[in-house]
C-alpha cells in the first residue's frame, strides 16, 4: 500500500485583532454545548463570578484568591506535576511513569493508579494535577518526553488518558491534561537549539509550571498545547484558521519567544492528535495546558481555532485553558483567543480594563474566563470543604496508604517479555548467578537527585525508576534489582557475583579485588565473571526527559557489555528499562541471549517488580505500546531542527507507517510473550444497523453525544492452552473502506484478561461510533463510511489470530 503524500503546508499568521464575529466563540453562556453533569458546576461558578467586580475577576484569572462582596472566598488553586506522584513532596509515593502504565494494557490498572495518585494529591491539599500527559504522542522515537505519555497509538492513549482523568475527578481532584497539541519534541521548543524551559513566562503564577519543583508556592503554567492557523492545503479551509490575534509582531504587552511550529493538516490533527483529548474531555477534564510551541504558525496558547473553535466548541470542553512555560506571549492575543488563566505581568488590571474599554475583549469573554477557572473546582466538589489544608512540601503528612503494593503490581504487569528461548524464564533457584550493568544498582546519590538532562549522557549511571523535569516522581526509597536479587539469593541459597557497571577493565585501582582462597578467587573481568554461571543477568537503561530529545536509540557500551557476557555465558538474560524505543539488533540474535525483559520506568518498587517477573511470581502480560525497529533508519520521522516542522507523514506514525510500507520490525506494536500459551477461536460480530453518515446527537461535553454510542460488538473466545495461569491481552484491529483513507489497520479495542490454565473466557469488544468514523475535512465532521469493515483479533498488530468483517450502510 502506498500512503498518500501530504503536501507541505504554508501558513500565514493572522494580524487582525479582536474580530467581532469571534466574540461569542467558545463561550459557555452561548448554549452551543450541552453541559450535562457539568451544569451544576456552571451554575455555581456563574453565581460566584456574578458577585465579582472587574478587578476581582482579573485576580481570579491570574491565580490570586478572591473574596466576593458578601464574603465568599475562593482560594487560588494549587496545581502540581504530575501523573507519577506529587512532585517535590515528602511522604508521597513514586508511581510508575505513564508509559509503563500503558504497557500493562490493563484498564483496571490505569484507573487504579489514577485514583491512588489523586488520593495523595488530595491528602496534601493540592487541588489540580498537571496531568494526565497525553502528549507528546510519539511522532518520532527520538522525542525526549515520550516516557511521560501513553504512547503513539491514539486509541490506546485515549483510553488511558480518559481513565486517568475519570479517576482524578472521582477522588475530587481536577485533571489538567497536557500538552495541547502537536508538541512532539523538545528541540527548539523555546526557539533556541536546546529544549530550554523551566521558568514561568511571567509573574503571579504560583506552583504548577513545568519543572515545578523549582518554582515556589502558588500556581504556574505547565505543559504544552497547540493552535492551528489556516492551511492552504486544507479543503474548505474551515476549522484551521489562525484566529484573531495571531500576529508574530508582539505588542508592548508581549514576552519574547520563537518556538518551532508543528504544521499538520486537519485530517491528521483530528484522527491522530486530537483523539485522546476527546477521551479526556468526555471523562471529566477540568483543565487543559496549551503548549509553548506553535501549530501551523500560531502559538498554541493564542490560537482561536484551536482553543475556541476546536477545544471549547467541537470538543465541548467546559474547563480552563492555562499556558505552559512561555506559552503566553501576547496579552491580547491570548485573552481574545481562548486562554483562561495567565500571567499577571501580562494581564495586569490596567491592561485588561483597557481591552474592555476598547472592545478588544468583551465583558462576556472576561466572565467566561473567570467561570472556567472555577468549573473544575465545582465539578469535583472541592467546594464541600472536606479537603485537608495545603501541606508544606516537607510536612509530615503521610498519604501513601498501601500504594507500594499497587506500584509493585503495576510495575510487574507492565514488563514485556520479548524473548524466552528454551523457557529460560522464569528462574528457579539458580545455584550461581552473575549480575552486570550499572542499572542493577542504585546511583551514588539518591533516590532523588536534581540533574540537567540537556547535554547529559543517554544512559543513567544507576537504576533509573523515574524521569526528570516534569516527569520526575519523588522517590521515598528505591528498590533496585540488586536489592531484590540479594533477598532472593538469601532465600534460595544462590551464589551471586556482580559487576555493577556498563564498562569495566581490570586496571590498577579497580574496585574488584582478588581475595580469598583459590577456590573462590576470580580474575576481575566481565568474561571471567560470566563463565560457568547458571544464569547471567545484564541490566541496561536509557535516559531522556524534559529539555532535550534523545541522541541515540542504542548504546555502544551497553551493547558491548551484553555481547561480552553472552560470549561467555550460555544463559544470558537482558533486562531493559528505557524511556522509549531501544534498538536491540547488535545482540538480540546472539545464541546465548536466551531471554529479554523490557519495560519503562517503574517507580519506587522497580527492583521488586522486575524480580517478580524474572522468578515467575508474576506471569508477564505487558505489551509494547510502540514499534521496536531493526535499525534507526526504519523509522520515518526524525527530530526537526528547523523553525517549520511539517508533519508530512500525516497519520502514518509508528506501526501504521510500518504496516503501510511493509517494513518488518524487530518487535511490533502490541507484542509481548507469556510463560503460557493462548488460543483464539469463535469470532462473532454483531454489526450495526444503518447509521447516519454524520452524528445527529446534541453537541455536548466530549463532542456530539452519539459519537460515544456503541454501534457494533466483536466477541472472541480465548483459551489458556499452556501449563501456567496467566493473563492475555487480546487486541482488536479494524480496517476501513477505502473512501475513509485510513491506515491498513488501527487498534480499536483491547482487554487484559486473566485465565487459569486449561480454561477459556469470552471477550467482547464494543465499537463506538467514533471508532469507525473518519474526519471529513470538507464537511468538518466525523463521518461513517459505507462499505465493508474488516476486523482482526490477535496478540499483537501483526500476530492476528482470527478475522471477520461487517458491512455498514449509511443514510442521510
From Swiss-Prot:
Places the protein is found: Secreted
Catalytic residues as annotated in Swiss-Prot or TrEMBL: 324
Enzymatic reactions: Hydrolysis of terminal, non-reducing beta-D-glucosyl residues with release of beta-D-glucose
Bias kind Gly residues: ranges: 191-207, 236-245
Top-level taxon in the UniProt lineage: Eukaryota
Residues bearing attached sugar chains per UniProt: 53, 188, 296, 360, 384, 422, 501, 592, 646
Main location: secreted
Family classification: Belongs to the glycosyl hydrolase 3 family.
Protein name (record): Probable beta-glucosidase D
Lineage: Eukaryota, Fungi, Dikarya, Ascomycota, Pezizomycotina
Amino acid at each position: 500500500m502506498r500512503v498518500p503524500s501530504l503536501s507541505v503546508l504554508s501558513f500565514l499568521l493572522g494580524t487582525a485583532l479582536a474580530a467581532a464575529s469571534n466574540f461569542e466563540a467558545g463561550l459557555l453562556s452561548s448554549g452551543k454545548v450541552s453541559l450535562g453533569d457539568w451544569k451544576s458546576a456552571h451554575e455555581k461558578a456563574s453565581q460566584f463570578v456574578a458577585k465579582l467586580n472587574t478587578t476581582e475577576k482579573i485576580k481570579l484569572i491570574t491565580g490570586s484568591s478572591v473574596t466576593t462582596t458578601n464574603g465568599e472566598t475562593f482560594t487560588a488553586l494549587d496545581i502540581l506535576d504530575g501523573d507519577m506522584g506529587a512532585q517535590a513532596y515528602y511522604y508521597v509515593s513514586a508511581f510508575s511513569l505513564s508509559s509503563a502504565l500503558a504497557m500493562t494494557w490493563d484498564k483496571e490498572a490505569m484507573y487504579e493508579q489514577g485514583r491512588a495518585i489523586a488520593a495523595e494529591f488530595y491528602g496534601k491539599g493540592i487541588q489540580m494535577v498537571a496531568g494526565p500527559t497525553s502528549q507528546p504522542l510519539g511522532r518520532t522515537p527520538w522525542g525526549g518526553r515520550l516516557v511521560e505519555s501513553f504512547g503513539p497509538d491514539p486509541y490506546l492513549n485515549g483510553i488511558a488518558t480518559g481513565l486517568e482523568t475519570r479517576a482524578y475527578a472521582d477522588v475530587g481532584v481536577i485533571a489538567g491534561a497536557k500538552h495541547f497539541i502537536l508538541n512532539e519534541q523538545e528541540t527548539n521548543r523555546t526557539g533556541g537549539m536546546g529544549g530550554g524551559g523551566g521558568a514561568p513566562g511571567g509573574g503571579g503564577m504560583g506552583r504548577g509550571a513545568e519543572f515545578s519543583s523549582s518554582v515556589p508556592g502558588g500556581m504556574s503554567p505547565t505543559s504544552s498545547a497547540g493552535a492551528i492557523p489556516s492551511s492552504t492545503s486544507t479543503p474548505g479551509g474551515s476549522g484551521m484558521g489562525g484566529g484573531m490575534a495571531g500576529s508574530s509582531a508582539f505588542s508592548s504587552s508581549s514576552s519574547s519567544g520563537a518556538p518551532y511550529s508543528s504544521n499538520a493538516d486537519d485530517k491528521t490533527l483530528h484522527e491522530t492528535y486530537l483523539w485522546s483529548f476527546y477521551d479526556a474531555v468526555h471523562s471529566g477534564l477540568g483543565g487543559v495546558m496549551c503548549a509553548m510551541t506553535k501549530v501551523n504558525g500560531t502559538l498554541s496558547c493564542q490560537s482561536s481555532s484551536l482553543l475556541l473553535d476546536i477545544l471549547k466548541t467541537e470538543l465541548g470542553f467546559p474547563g480552563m485553558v492555562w499556558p505552559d512555560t512561555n506559552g503566553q506571549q501576547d496579552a491580547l492575543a491570548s485573552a481574545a483567543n481562548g486562554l483562561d488563566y495567565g500571567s499577571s505581568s501580562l494581564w495586569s488590571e490596567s491592561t485588561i480594563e483597557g481591552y474592555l474599554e476598547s472592545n478588544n475583549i468583551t465583558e462576556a469573554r472576561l466572565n467566561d474566563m473567570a467561570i472556567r477557572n472555577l468549573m473544575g473546582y465545582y465539578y469535583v466538589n472541592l467546594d464541600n470543604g472536606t479537603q485537608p489544608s495545603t501541606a508544606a512540601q516537607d510536612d509530615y503528612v503521610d498519604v501513601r496508604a498501601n500504594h507500594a503494593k499497587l506500584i509493585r503490581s503495576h510495575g510487574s504487569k507492565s514488563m514485556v517479555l520479548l524473548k524466552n528461548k528454551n523457557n529460560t524464564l522464569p528462574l528457579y533457584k539458580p545455584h550461581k548467578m552473575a549480575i552486570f550493568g550499572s542499572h542493577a544498582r542504585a546511583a551514588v546519590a539518591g533516590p532523588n537527585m536534581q540533574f540537567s538532562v540537556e547535554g547529559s549522557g543517554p544512559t543513567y549511571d544507576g537504576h533509573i525508576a523515574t524521569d526528570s523535569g516534569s516527569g520526575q516522581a519523588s522517590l521515598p526509597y528505591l528498590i533496585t534489582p540488586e536489592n531484590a536479587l540479594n533477598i532472593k539469593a538469601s532465600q534460595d541459597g544462590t551464589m551471586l557475583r556482580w559487576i555493577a557497571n556498563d564498562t569495566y577493565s581490570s586496571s590498577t585501582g579497580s574496585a574488584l579485588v582478588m581475595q580469598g582462597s583459590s577456590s573462590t578467587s576470580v580474575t576481575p573481568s566481565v568474561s571471567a565473571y560470566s563463565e560457568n554461571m547458571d544464569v547471567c543477568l545484564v541490566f541496561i537503561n536509557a535516559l531522556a526527559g524534559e529539555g532535550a530529545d534523545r541522541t541515540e536509540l542504542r548504546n555502544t557500551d551497553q551493547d558491548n557489555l551484553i555481547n561480552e557476557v553472552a560470549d561467555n555465558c550460555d544463559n544470558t538474560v537482558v533486562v531493559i528499562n528505557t524511556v522509549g524505543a531501544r534498538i536491540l539488533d547488535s545482540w538480540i540474535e546472539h545464541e546465548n541471549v536466551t531471554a529479554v525483559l523490557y519495560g519503562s520506568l517503574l517507580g519506587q518498587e522497580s527492583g521488586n517488580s522486575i524480580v517478580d517477573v524474572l522468578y515467575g511470581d508474576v506471569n508477564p502480560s505487558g505489551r509494547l505500546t510502540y514499534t521496536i525497529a531493526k535499525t534507526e533508519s526504519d523509522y520515518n520521522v526524525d527530530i526537526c531542527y528547523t523553525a517549520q516542522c511539517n508533519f508530512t507523514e500525516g497519520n502514518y506514525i509508528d506501526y501504521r507507517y510500518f504496516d503501510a510500507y511493509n517494513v518488518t520490525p524487530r518487535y511490533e506494536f502490541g507484542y509481548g510473550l507469556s510463560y503460557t500459551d493462548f488460543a483464539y477461536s469463535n469470532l462473532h460480530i454483531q454489526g450495526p444497523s444503518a447509521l447516519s453518515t454524520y452524528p445527529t446527537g446534541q453537541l455536548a461535553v466530549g463532542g456530539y453525544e452519539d459519537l460515544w454510542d456503541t454501534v457494533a460488538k466483536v466477541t472472541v473466545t480465548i483459551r489458556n492452552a499452556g501449563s501456567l495461569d496467566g493473563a492475555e491481552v487480546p487486541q482488536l484491529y479494524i480496517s476501513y473502506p477505502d473512501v475513509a483513507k485510513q491506515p491498513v489497520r488501527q487498534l480499536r479495542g483491547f482487554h487484559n484478561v486473566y485465565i487459569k490454565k486449561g480454561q477459556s473466557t469470552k471477550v467482547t469488544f464494543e465499537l463506538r461510533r467514533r471508532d469507525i468514523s473518519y474526519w471529513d475535512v470538507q464537511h468538518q465532521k466525523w463521518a461513517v463510511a459505507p462499505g465493508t469493515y474488516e476486523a482482526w483479533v490477535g496478540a499483537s498488530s501483526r500476530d492476528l489470530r482470527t478475522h471477520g468483517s461487517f458491512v455498514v450502510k449509511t443514510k442521510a
